[in-house]
Amino acid sequence: VISKSCLVPELQSIADNFWHYSEKVYSRPEVKQHCLWLQNQHQRNVNLLLWLSFCQQQHWTVNLELLLIQIRSSEQKLSDFRKHRQAMKPHLSERQYQLLLKHELKLERRQQQLLVLSQQRHPGGQTAELALNTYIEQPEEAAQYLSTLKAALQ
């Protein structure tokens, strides 16, 4: 797990920019809905979807295979925690539930830092748009996702 202090300033700046980008686009209901649909119906990682779209905005190339390998462990932890949080919801006060959500956001941010670190170590040669299409696996879904993001950024 990467803590904030482990990232050199340049990488921390990229991680912070990515986090703010994610907050901005994910706060749009249509983007959130589409991301969650891809997560729930097609087991796609929301952070990776957002990262690939962020990389596309930056005109960066990526190595999708290595990105997937890098986040595999953190994705399992996040998924397990998310299931636990959802199962516990009926048994918790609103304050307790909000604490679990806050912890989940910390896990999400750490996963984003892993993506940034992996990108800097292994930038790859695949355009981010091609990687996004490959990752989503369905051209029409990828096009719709990109269209939704584009509208959210305007």
Question: Residue ranges of each PLM-predicted region?
Answer:
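Short runs of predominantly hydrophobic/aromatic residues within well-ordered alpha helices
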Residues: 15-18, 44-48, 93, 97, ...
